[in-house]
Amino acid sequence: LSLHDALPIYSGNNFLDDVFIKSEEYTKLRSLLLAKKNIILQGAPGVGKTYSAKRLAYSIIGEEDRTKVEFIQFHQNYSYEDFVMGYKPKEDGGFELRRGVFYNFCRKAQSDSDKKYFFIIDEINRGNMSKIFGELLMLIENDYRGEKHKIRLAYNDEYFSVPENLYIIGMMNTADR
């Protein structure tokens, strides 16, 4: 994307045109996410939770900026090593410490703290939250965001915090409850 390529504008009105939801419900959903920093959308499979979550993020960002939205899907084998960091085998033998998708996205959001970033987790109920988030589980709460609540990571003793400009949208199927 060059400096001359403008991203498509995406507003609350665009969201209402694209997603089958009442204006009052959109306002409530948007306000709740901005205040709490975390929400879970639930519904039957195939109703458009992923579509809605991405568009909710774009409507808050104000444009369809895919660089500020990360999407992953949990499963029963998803782990802290995939999500935050862990040792992975190298092709030439041995192991190396690799940072996970959540760690990298948090760092990206921290380096651009005046913008909002959205981390969308599909099938959030299929993963073991304690196993995946580890010591970061507390840090996703709104009251524990930011540098003043940083903690030391298990694998490398690095201090880490979940940035205040990161919003998490989890999704789950009601059939899985």
How would you name each of these model-derived features?
Residues 6-177:
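AAA+ P-loop NTPase catalytic core and its hallmark functional loops
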Residues 1-5:
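Extracellular interaction modules
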